[in-house]
């Protein structure tokens, strides 16, 4: 765990490095130190086989990177930063979706590259890293939404104009549809049907939402009949 003085130093160094066109030796050394920390932490993670244990370890490690992240976002320079993009992905893995989206907005706006081991675009990574666990959770328990609808809506808005495979965007629309169908709000249920329809259009063979759409349409029809008799 970093001391308050170390946290302050890392934030200031990150801000200065990203605010300067020609970072000083001290600022570059600070970045190299963060990359070294990242390599060591990745080595620790590589020795862990359980995905849950990996997520727990990432959650434990992330606070030491937060001052650097705040400095980068404050400088808002758009320089590439492997620490920033890696932390964004770790936040997805830990379920800290709000922070992942906060960083993701910056990464997408500045069109920053992903770390070398990721051969997907930022938008694709964000959608898959967030929505794959959401859909897996719904498969295990369809009655509980693992991520709030407003966060998934934010992800949709963030990636709306970004290029990605249709199958990937279909996952996001399916996750949104499954989340909104758990409400008793007619508007949300109507939106759920529309999202699931869009998911089916983008991935007609594998979306697997035909039955869900039928059930939702029946529920909406019953709701309309009930309101007509009030």
Role assignments for model-derived ranges:
Residues 92-95, 131-138, 177, 182-186, ...:
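Short coil/turn linking the two alpha-helices of tandem helical-hairpin repeats
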């Amino acid at each position: 765990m970093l001391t308050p003085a170390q946290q302050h130093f890392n934030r200031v160094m990150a801000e200065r490095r990203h605010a300067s066109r020609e970072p000083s030796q001290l600022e570059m050394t600070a970045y190299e130190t963060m990359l070294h920390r990242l390599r060591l932490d990745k080595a620790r993670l590589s020795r862990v086989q359980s995905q849950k244990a990996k997520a727990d370890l990432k959650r434990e490690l992330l606070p030491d990177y937060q001052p650097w992240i705040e400095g980068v976002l404050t400088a808002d320079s758009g320089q590439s930063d492997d620490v920033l993009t890696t932390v964004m992905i770790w936040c997805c893995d830990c379920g800290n979706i709000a922070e992942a989206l906060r960083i993701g907005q910056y990464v997408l706006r500045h069109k920053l590259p992903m770390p070398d081991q990721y051969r997907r675009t930022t938008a694709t990574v964000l959608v898959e890293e967030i929505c794959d666990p959401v859909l897996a959770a719904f498969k295990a328990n369809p009655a509980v939404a693992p991520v709030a609808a407003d966060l998934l809506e934010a992800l949709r808005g963030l990636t709306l104009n970004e290029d990605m495979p249709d199958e990937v965007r279909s996952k996001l629309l399916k996750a949104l549809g499954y989340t909104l169908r758990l409400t008793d709000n007619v508007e949300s249920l109507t939106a759920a049907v529309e999202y699931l329809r869009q998911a089916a259009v983008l991935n007609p063979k594998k979306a697997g939402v035909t039955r869900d759409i039928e059930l939702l349409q029946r529920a909406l029809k019953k709701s309309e009949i009930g309101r007509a008799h009030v």
